[in-house]
Amino acid sequence: MTHYIQGQWHAGKGHDVASMNPANTHTIWTGKTATAEQVNAAVDAARAAQFDWFMLGFDARLAIVETYRSQLEANKAELAETIAQETGKPQWETATEVGAMIGKIALSAAAYNKRTGTEANDTPAGRAVIRHKPHGVVAVFGPYNFPGHLPNGHIVPALLAGNTVIFKPSELTPKVAELMVSLWDKAGLPAGVLNLVQGEVDTGKALASHPQLDGLFFTGSSRTGHFLHQQYAGHPGKILALEMGGNNPLIIKGVQDIKAAVHDILQSAYISSGQRCTCARRLYVEQGEQGDALIAMLADAVKQIKVGPWNSQPQPFMGSMISETAAKGMVAAQANLLNLGGVSLVELTHLEAGTGLVSPGLIDVTAIDALPDEEYFGPLLQLVRYSDFDQAIKLANQTRYGLSAGLLADSREDYDYFLARIRAGIVNWNKQITGASGAAPFGGVGASGNHRASAFYAADYCAYPVASVEADTVSLPATLSPGLSL
């Protein structure tokens, strides 16, 4: 059970791959990658199934998707544990991820009807009707940080709209993908409607470049997203939806309850071991005694964050990063910032060789003149002290990204001022910036995406509008155009 093509499970014909629990390096999944021929077979299966899937109609498609929701409910404990073991995230957090997957079904159905349903109006020219049709065959590339929820957020609306899908998950989370697709199979999804190909870069390239794709929906790094954007530049007929990362700012201004502010900072910067695309990377705190007090409390709170394996009891706030490589990357990022003039307030350390376990870090980068505009994808928060609000907003906007941003402030006037000037697709006030609603769009500007917001707006890129003017019979107009006689 590695690849799912035309409703059947197949062994891979490529090279050996394995998935390890990043908290203890135990191997939890093995398989072989999909070859280009197997990718072709998956695309062919999706193409053959697409028209019949569309012609079932929305209600019939929804019934199958709702059966999948029932499968998620029945298997939520196993799915949450699988996500925890493969990503290293604590069990409390993976349970919330599965809950989000279940909730996505109703939200996606509502979004389909609201964003891409059918509307008819009588006009003097005839009955004007707006309908929506699926693009056809689409690929979904999933990330490792939310290996269930984020690809689910593409797959469910794509299927509801009548598309067929080839799912290529992260090579770091193949077991989660296999379990997800097995639940779709149990839900009675017709053969070829959803196909799974596992693999690394070569598999991804074979799928992304396939001439029979009508679209590709991607969640992942800005680097890979930009590569896909370049690849699709000469194909205006294909829909490309990119959901990428961010170098996200959080500004603190005039907050009286600094304990509450510290809580929101911790939730913004360190949840999921900093491996959320919306995590705060840069923290802007006012100069002065109040800012000093907040930073002192924050540093103490960061030192007290509990870190541990996915199954530790009592449960930790932070689990493992996705791999030892990722952990070492964060140590290197911290060293680079220190070399540039940063001052460590709480040192990020690699806790155990061979694992992805790291402690959270806090570094004052105020003295760095040219702060690197990088998304350091882990639990390292960069602190900048500012003298006035306009300076803070200017610094916050000094990024090529534009995913999330936030303001913790007691003044509504300050928030309105901030909201009008900050450049980001997700802007929160007095809430953690990792908090997003599935009933709202999710996406950013700049290097964070290509204006294809997901979540509630995923329906928009899963179908295209068809405008019609209709009449029940062919009839001669009462008045002919000048120059015509009949």
From Swiss-Prot:
Enzyme nomenclature, EC number: 1.2.1.71
CDD domains reported in the protein's UniProt record: ALDH_SGSD_AstD
Gene Ontology MF annotations: succinylglutamate-semialdehyde dehydrogenase activity
Cysteines joined through disulfide linkages: none
Top-level enzyme category: oxidoreductase
InterPro entries according to UniProt: Ald_DH/histidinol_DH, Ald_DH_C, Ald_DH_CS_CYS, Ald_DH_CS_GLU, Ald_DH_N, Aldehyde_DH_dom, SuccinylGlu_semiald_DH_AstD
Catalytic reaction list: N-succinyl-L-glutamate 5-semialdehyde + NAD(+) + H2O = N-succinyl-L-glutamate + NADH + 2 H(+)
Keywords, comma-separated and alphabetical: Arginine metabolism, NAD, Oxidoreductase
GO biological process: arginine catabolic process to glutamate; arginine catabolic process to succinate
Chain residues that bind NAD(+): G220, S221, S222, R223, T224, G225
Record pathway: Amino-acid degradation; L-arginine degradation via AST pathway; L-glutamate and succinate from L-arginine: step 4/5
Annotated PROSITE patterns: ALDEHYDE_DEHYDR_CYS, ALDEHYDE_DEHYDR_GLU
Pfam families membership: Aldedh
Active-site residues from the entry: E243, C277
Entry-linked PANTHER family: ALDEHYDE DEHYDROGENASE-RELATED
Family classification: Belongs to the aldehyde dehydrogenase family. AstD subfamily.
Biological role: Catalyzes the NAD-dependent reduction of succinylglutamate semialdehyde into succinylglutamate.
Protein name (database record): N-succinylglutamate 5-semialdehyde dehydrogenase
Source species: Shewanella baltica (strain OS223)
